[in-house]
Swiss-Prot record:
Its EC number is 2.3.1.-. This is tRNA-acetylating toxin 2. It comes from Salmonella enteritidis. The gene is tacT2. InterPro entries: Acyl_CoA_acyltransferase, GNAT_dom. One of its GO terms (biological process) is regulation of translation.
Length: 163
């Protein structure tokens, strides 16, 4: 059984987490709590019954220039365009292939939609670390940047339609 995403806190057990990508595992174990404390990003975790983290994602505010954005994304927007960055998203190897990553993207999308009621946001942006990750994000509705195929974006309107 896996919990619904909740904000990372000191009671969560991070050490056993292993998604298969060292840099993503290490970010959770070494940076996530520091970023949570300083406000640099917010991390949301799903745990097993023992508080071991089994999946996570992080969100941060940012902006993207219009020339790096797909046409629909930049239409009628200022330069730079306000966005939320889906900074990290990972699932423990024990849960790969069970739809957890897709559920995390949905949860992140719902949070972004909620925040957009208070502050201006055009959508969500992600930097894919691999071709496999890029293909996943495209399957869940993200569109690649015309300048960098590993930077993908989804508009707020598309998020609303997909969640």
């Amino acid at each position: 059984m896996i919990s619904t995403p909740e904000p990372l806190h000191a009671g969560h057990i991070l050490t056993p987490f292993c998604c298969g990508v060292d840099s993503i595992d290490n970010w959770l174990k070494q940076r996530a709590m520091k970023n949570q404390t300083t406000g640099a990003s917010r991390t949301f975790v799903c745990c097993g019954s023992d508080s071991n983290v089994l999946a996570y994602y992080s969100l941060a505010s940012s902006a993207v220039t219009t020339n790096t954005s797909p046409g629909r994304f930049r239409r009628n927007m200022p330069d730079p365009i306000p966005v939320v960055v889906l900074g990290r998203l990972a699932v423990d190897k024990s849960l790969h292939g069970q739809g957890v990553a897709r559920a995390l993207v949905r949860d992140a999308g719902l949070r972004v939609i909620q925040v957009a009621e208070t502050i201006g946001i055009r959508g969500m942006l992600v930097h894919a670390l691999s071709d496999e990750a890029r293909e996943f994000y495209q399957r869940v509705g993200f569109v690649p940047s015309p300048m960098d195929p590993m930077m993908l974006m989804v508009t707020l309107g598309d998020l609303v339609e997909s969640v």
